[in-house]
């Protein structure tokens, strides 16, 4: 029985692995389904001819949803617009959500030089909270309150030495549990990181980035394209209820099944979204080739799908055309209905409305040319 009390720092947080069975028949059955869905996602990503299409779009959607879980609310449109604008013109919520994307990429790059570890978590949290410097908590006073009641529902461990010790155990569990499926490791490690709550802010977002990095490190994905925060947003009450269920009753099975179902649901959703983007890419390519043959190149079509908003400078940077010619190309693409010109402040942007429609919505249909 847990000796946990909501108002007392949980310095007795049990280490990993749990004493409870986390490989029950039910868990393993759900794990097989989630692994199959992830394998389909990995294959779908490999079949996209230009990986930038995924790496520039799906992490932005994950950044928006993961930030929304923490009540940092912006829109998909604003995020993609802001990628093409000066940072000083971004509103605070959009800027913080984009920092999540920056942190995700920084974590992804770090896997080439060191395994997932406490230092990775510190680096990721610092990128999320920039310009504030984040370090392992040294003082007490951190407590999590219920959204409606305002009552304290959980007080994480206190003391830097205690927290670092629990993170060291978390790290060992990730790397020394080879007999466990990586998805079960991810689910258990995610609970533990949330329970340790090592920083004064940014813990939830850091933990969700670490999920993606763990899947890449274990070889289940090649790119950080799992949009798991979408599932958590849709099932947010269950997310917090099941986290607390592990703390109160050591109910690991319900929590792990929730995460496995989320991985399967999200991977299947993303495969369908990738398929829709591929169909739109082919339609766009054919439409430009038919109605603007003089400017058609494969490089130009690729660029239009790397982000839903394009500007003249993007064509210049890609070596497709000089400024005056690039302006002519974008005007012609607007004339044939591929792009739509908009002006935001001093910025002239060209939106691919059909691509934006796909990225903004749940559905996978789009208006044909």
From Swiss-Prot:
Gene3D superfamilies found in the cross-reference section: Fido-like domain
Origin superkingdom: Bacteria
Residue span(s) of domain Fido: 111-261
InterPro entries reported in the protein's UniProt record: Fic/DOC_N (IPR025758), Fido (IPR003812), Fido-like_dom_sf (IPR036597), Fido_containing (IPR040198), SoFic-like (IPR026287), SoFic-like_C (IPR048770)
Coiled-coil segments on the chain, per record: none
Pfam families recorded: Fic, Fic_N, SoFic-like_C
More details: Present in outer membrane vesicle formulations which are used as vaccines in human.
Protein name as annotated: Uncharacterized protein NMB0459
Species of origin: Neisseria meningitidis serogroup B (strain ATCC BAA-335 / MC58)
């Amino acid at each position: 029985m847990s000796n946990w009390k909501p108002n007392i720092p949980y310095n007795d947080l049990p280490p990993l692995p749990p004493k409870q069975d986390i490989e029950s028949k039910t868990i393993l059955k759900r794990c097989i389904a989630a692994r199959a869905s992830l394998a389909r996602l990995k294959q779908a990503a490999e079949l996209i001819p230009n990986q930038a299409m995924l790496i520039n779009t799906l992490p932005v959607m994950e950044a928006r949803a993961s930030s929304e879980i923490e009540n940092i609310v912006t829109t998909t449109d604003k995020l993609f617009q802001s990628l093409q604008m000066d940072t000083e013109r971004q509103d605070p919520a959009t800027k913080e959500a984009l920092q999540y994307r920056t942190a995700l990429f920084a974590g992804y790059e770090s896997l080439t030089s060191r395994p997932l570890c406490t230092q990775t978590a510190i680096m990721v949290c610092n990128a999320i909270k920039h310009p504030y410097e984040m370090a392992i908590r040294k003082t007490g006073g951190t407590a999590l309150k219920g959204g409606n009641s305002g009552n304290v529902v959980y007080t994480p461990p206190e003391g830097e030495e205690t927290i670092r010790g629990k993170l060291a155990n978390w790290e060992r569990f990730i790397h020394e549990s080879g007999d466990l499926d990586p998805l079960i490791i991810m689910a258990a490690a995610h609970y533990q990181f949330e329970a340790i709550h090592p920083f004064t802010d940014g813990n939830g977002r850091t933990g969700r980035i670490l999920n993606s990095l763990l899947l890449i490190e274990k070889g289940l994905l090649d790119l950080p394209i799992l949009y798991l925060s979408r599932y958590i947003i849709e099932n947010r009450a269950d997310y917090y209820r099941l986290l607390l269920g592990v703390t109160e009753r050591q109910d690991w099975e319900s929590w792990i099944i929730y995460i496995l179902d989320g991985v399967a649901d999200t991977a299947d959703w993303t495969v369908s979204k990738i398929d829709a983007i591929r169909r739109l890419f082919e339609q766009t390519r054919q439409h430009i080739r038919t109605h603007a043959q003089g400017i058609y190149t494969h490089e130009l079509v690729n660029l239009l799908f790397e982000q839903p908003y394009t500007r003249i400078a993007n064509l210049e940077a890609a070596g497709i055309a000089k400024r005056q010619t690039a302006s002519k190309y974008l005007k012609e693409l607007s004339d044939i209905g591929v792009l739509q010109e908009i002006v935001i402040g001093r910025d002239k942007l060209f939106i691919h409305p059909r691509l934006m429609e796909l990225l903004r919505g749940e559905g996978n249909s789009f208006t044909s040319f």
